[in-house]
Swiss-Prot record:
Protein name: Large ribosomal subunit protein uL5
One MF term in the entry's GO annotations: rRNA binding
GO cellular component, one term: ribosome
Lineage, broadest ranks: Bacteria, Pseudomonadati, Pseudomonadota, Gammaproteobacteria, Pseudomonadales
A Pfam family: Ribosomal_L5_C
Cited NCBIfam families: PRK00010.1
Gene name of the record: rplE
GO terms, biological process: translation
Record carries keyword Ribonucleoprotein: yes
Subunit structure as annotated in this protein's UniProt entry: Part of the 50S ribosomal subunit; part of the 5S rRNA/L5/L18/L25 subcomplex. Contacts the 5S rRNA and the P site tRNA. Forms a bridge to the 30S subunit in the 70S ribosome.
Family assignment from sequence similarity: Belongs to the universal ribosomal protein uL5 family.
Length: 179
């Protein structure tokens, strides 16, 4: 079992049950999935960009990546319907907890000038989104083998009913919020 999942079951869930005054342990908010998305506007001119992004995201997550395609043609962005414009991957269960553990203990401390995560990046329903400016903060990516620095979006979907419950859950996981 993943280290963070065990910590959640034995320490975090009982603590949150008391803190949020819930009657049943199944009511305690939990992380259901983590979605990583890489929007690749530069892929319009060069199809190799998608291949490199797929390889990077597969190394980071250890899971097959899905290529996302444009839904509509937009002349201003020089995009046609059906063209590949991004890659994404959804992590659940064990892989999700293992990724979260690596993110908190290894990757975030490697970010340059890191002052903490913004505590206001919740969506109103307890889900948290954050952006990473460069993929080299992950230990799986070899700096010498990348073609370009690319950012990615990380979204944590939780069962929390509101932002306060979601914030309490992520604070219990020791997320380094700055405010």
């Amino acid at each position: 079992m993943a280290r963070l999942k065990e910590i959640y079951r034995k320490e975090i869930a009982p603590k949150l049950k008391e803190e949020l005054k819930l009657s049943n342990v199944m009511e305690v908010p939990r992380v259901t999935k983590i979605t990583l998305n890489m929007g690749l506007g530069e892929a319009i001119g060069d199809k190799k960009v998608i291949e490199h992004a797929v390889a990077d995201l597969e190394k980071i997550t250890g899971q097959k990546v899905v290529v996302t395609y444009a839904r509509k043609s937009i002349a201003g962005f020089k995009v046609r319907e059906g063209w590949p414009i991004g890659v994404k991957v959804t992590l659940r269960r064990e892989r999700m907890y293992e990724f979260l553990d690596r993110l908190l203990s290894i990757s975030l401390p490697r970010v340059r000038d890191f002052r903490g995560l913004n505590a206001k990046s919740f969506d109103g329903r307890g889900n948290y989104s954050m952006g990473v400016k460069e993929q080299i903060i992950f230990p799986e990516i070899d700096y010498d083998k990348i073609d370009a620095l690319r950012g990615l979006d990380i979204t944590l979907t939780t069962t929390a009913k509101n932002d306060d419950e979601g914030r309490a859950l992520l604070r219990a996981f020791k997320f380094p919020f700055r405010n």
